[in-house]
Design a protein with these regions (language model features):
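Short aromatic-enriched loop/helix-cap "lid" or pocket-rim segments at secondary-structure transitions
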Residues: 14-15, 39-42, 103-108
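Aromatic pocket-lining residues of Rossmann-like dinucleotide-binding sites
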Residues: 21, 81-85
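Active-site loop/oxyanion-hole signature of alpha/beta-hydrolase fold enzymes
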Residues: 28-69
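Gly/Ala-rich beta-loop-alpha elbow adjacent to hydrolase catalytic centers
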Residues: 70-78
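Flexible "cap/lid" loop of the alpha/beta hydrolase fold
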Residues: 83, 89-121
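Conserved serine/cysteine hydrolase catalytic core
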Residues: 161-183
């Protein structure tokens, strides 16, 4: 099971590796509500999205998966799937997941501060702020392929993604608790 990162499209995170993995594994890749061009819905909450993932695994995999890999935000889903114990996974792998948690007030402040800065990058493929866009271009010129690879993983312009989906995802991730010592 592959779970993409914050505000990311599944194809940009995993499109290149799915064909390689399919040679040896049955591959499932999550498409979060609000982040795919084929749907016109919005991301609800981490728990609502987790319930949908669990329901799919229960119905289509008998409640058992061999492994789940979560990139960034996807790691929070791996943690939630393990903690809730509604499905069984043999291995949970976190990739660059910070698992940050915050109070509702702190989460709202972070969301309200960061989203206006990064949402234009998600929607239009570039920052609205000339300062941030120039910093990105300078960093890209200095670090070349690394920055280009990161931006490709993040995805190109996605005008179908709403600000509300981004807010819901970012805020909900911060306020959804994960217990300590998940088995």
């Amino acid at each position: 099971l592959l779970l993409p990162g914050t505000c990311c499209h599944w194809k940009s995170n995993f499109g290149q590796v799915i064909p390689l993995l399919q040679r040896d594994f049955r591959v499932l890749c999550v498409n979060y509500d609000g982040f795919d061009e084929t749907e016109s819905n919005e991301f609800p909450t981490m728990l609502a999205e987790t319930e949908k993932i669990e329901a799919y695994i229960l119905k289509n995999c008998g409640g058992h998966i061999r492994a789940a890999y979560g990139c960034s935000l996807g790691g929070s889903f791996v943690g939630l799937l393990a903690a809730r114990q509604n499905i069984h996974m043999d291995y949970g792998i976190l990739g660059s997941s910070d698992l940050d948690q915050a109070s509702p007030l702190a989460a709202r402040l972070q969301t309200d501060f960061l989203l206006p800065l990064i949402y234009p990058l998600i929607r239009d493929g570039q920052f609205k702020s000339r300062f941030l866009q120039k910093r990105l271009e300078k960093c890209s010129a200095e670090k070349g392929d690394y920055v280009r690879a990161f931006m490709a993983m993040f995805g190109a312009a996605r005008p179908y993604v709403t600000m509300q989906s981004c807010k819901n995802q970012f805020y909900s991730d911060l306020i959804t608790p994960l217990p300590e010592g998940i088995d």
